[in-house]
A protein has these predicted regions:
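Soluble extracytoplasmic regions of secretory-pathway and membrane proteins
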Residues: 3-560
Length: 560
């Protein structure tokens, strides 16, 4: 009869217990930390390395010898990590890193074709910080004892739905047509409250273009909201864990909430895959999660629902722009030849013709002031447009607005402050726009415009219409003084046109005529009184040699 040595049995039991312990430890680690188990990410190799070290330590302590197999496994993992780490750097792939940005470099004349002129009614007058203050100070009330506002997402939405706010029986009917809004979920304020309450019951909705319209939504189309799958959720209500255990693998980024055309909230998560070793992640699609039911929909970039605005995370686009500007002549560029960089650390989100764009100015590598051009990247498609046109940066524009007579003293005495300048196409002019608020209030007190091409062209006023009128008047004054646009009598012509559109902005009137297509003509009522009156046909005197997209009318006569 053959007996198994006691030492062998003990060794087997020790090995079994050690294996079970390692399995339990890494199961808990994966469940809690939720690393990405994918061979193109570093997380799996970190686990392999940790397992190899534990096995090696076990074999040395229990068996009192260092196994060559275990040592070989450990060395193999370390070598793979070193090699992958090296080839994942721009040192070896500078050109590939630079090519991550899907960019079209265009002449400044194409600016108006892609970044459309924005109606004043669509301009963002409410910053993210202001939106948060409006809800927290005027809407949260006792709700703040059990939940808090989550991250706001900028969205442009076309929708039709009805809401009720917390504690209100009044039903509010929203009909949106490309309406820019801020949306944020109510999140659990602590893990204990997430355990106890299970769900939160609403989301915040703030109009970007109207600071008087902000809502804390509790019911949509008569049904109370039950938000369960949140970033602040615990255990299987944790949003990322919910995605992982339902088979959504790979890298994830930019967790946010957007509402669909029926007013219902959805978590939108960008899915990514590393493109160069462990680096340069690229967007491959979206995971869209019903916050209430937990239903998950995976889509490609082109197949994403229309209500999803933000597919490309800001962090990814910032990296792409940085690589595009830095590695223009490879990784080594001792003289910084042709290198460029963004003017600001963070990107601004601006609206144009139904789409949102990340915006940043672009300047030379060592520049501290003027810009070389403007970069716009579609938040949904990732398509970037770079317009080569010198101008001023956001800080210079904010300083120019802050130096205006109306706000200078308030800024100096810290009773007024400026929100970050946003970039817009105002009647064909690249323009920075900012709201001026009192330090003890969140509502805009003044509105300011500054040309991105000339910081001397500034308009500030208590109303948006007055501010843009002052700005345009200043612009036309500067334009008329420029050498190329001085209207001489020889260049002035008179023509009869049919009015197709007239828009009033303060005391400025903007005309489009059937005979001139998209060309715009301008006049001020304090100079040409007749522009105020309705007319079908007019005789206009203007500078025929002007190359500007906006032409100042020197004469205006109503015919019929």
């Amino acid at each position: 009869m053959t007996f198994i040595p006691v030492r062998t049995i003990r060794s087997f039991k020790s090995s079994l217990l050690a294996s079970l312990g390692i399995f339990v430890c890494f199961t808990l680690f994966n469940c809690l930390a939720m690393p990405v188990i994918s061979f193109d990410t570093i997380a799996i190799y970190v686990e392999y390395l940790a397992i190899a070290i534990l096995i090696l330590l076990y074999s040395g302590i229990v068996n009192e010898e260092w196994s060559k197999v275990n040592i070989g496994f450990l060395i193999s993992v370390v070598v793979v990590m070193l090699v992958m780490g090296c080839i994942s750097t721009p040192m070896f792939h500078a050109g590939d890193f630079r090519d991550q940005l899907n960019i079209e470099v265009q002449d400044s004349t194409a600016f108006d074709e892609n970044i459309h002129q924005i109606p004043l009614t669509k301009m963002n007058r409410v910053s993210e910080e202001t939106a948060r203050d409006l809800i927290e100070k005027h809407k949260m009330g006792e709700l703040s004892q059990k939940c808090e506002l989550g991250k706001f997402t900028a969205q442009v939405i076309t929708a039709d739905f009805k809401i009720n706010e917390f504690g209100s029986d009044e039903e509010i009917h929203f009909i949106f047509k490309e309406q820019p809004i801020w949306v944020a979920p109510l999140e659990h304020s602590s893990s204990w409250k997430a355990f106890r309450n299970g769900v939160t019951n609403g989301y915040a909705l703030v109009f970007q273009n109207d600071p008087s319209k902000y809502f804390l939504v509790n019911k949509v189309n008569g049904k109370e909201l039950q938000l369960q799958y949140l970033e602040s959720g615990v255990l299987f209500s944790d949003l990322e864990r919910h995605l992982r255990i339902n088979g959504v693998d790979g890298l994830m980024d930019d967790f946010g909430i957007e509402i669909n055309e029926h007013g219902l909230p959805f978590n939108t998560v960008s899915l990514l895959k590393n493109n160069i070793g462990w680096s340069a992640p690229k967007v491959t699609g979206m995971a869209i999660v019903d916050v209430q039911s937990g239903e998950i929909t995976r889509t490609g970039i082109e197949d994403a629902p229309a209500f999803v605005n933000r597919i490309y995370p800001e962090r990814i686009i910032k990296n792409h722009i940085s690589w595009w500007g830095e590695y223009v002549h490879g990784w080594i560029n001792l003289t910084d030849k042709d290198r460029k960089k963004a003017t600001e650390e963070d990107l601004e989100v601006v609206y144009s013709n139904g789409d949102n764009y990340y915006y940043t100015g672009i300047k030379s590598w060592n520049s501290k002031g003027s810009t070389l051009g403007m970069m716009f990247t579609n938040t949904r498609t990732g398509q970037a447009f770079y317009y080569e046109r010198t101008g001023i940066n956001e800080n210079d524009a904010e300083h120019a607005i802050a130096s205006h007579d109306l706000v200078r003293d308030g800024i100096r005495l810290n009773t007024l402050s400026l929100n970050d300048a946003l970039f817009y196409n105002i009647e064909g002019i690249p323009t920075y726009f900012s709201t001026v608020i009192a330090t003890n209030d969140v509502m805009p007190k003044y509105y300011g415009f500054c040309s991105a091409l000339n910081k001397q062209i500034v308009g500030v006023a208590p109303s948006l219409e007055e501010a843009v009128a002052e700005y345009m008047k200043k612009y036309l004054e500067v334009q008329s003084k420029s050498q190329s646009d001085i209207p001489s009598e020889a260049n002035l012509v008179e023509q009869t046109f049919t009015v197709s559109e007239k828009v009033q902005e303060g005391n400025m009137y903007i005309f489009r005529f059937k005979e001139t297509g998209t060309q715009q003509f301008y006049a001020f009522s304090d100079i040409l009184n007749d522009v105020r009156w309705k007319a079908a046909k007019v005789r206009v005197k203007y500078n025929a040699e002007s190359s500007q997209k906006m032409i100042l009318m020197s004469g205006f006569e109503i015919i019929e």
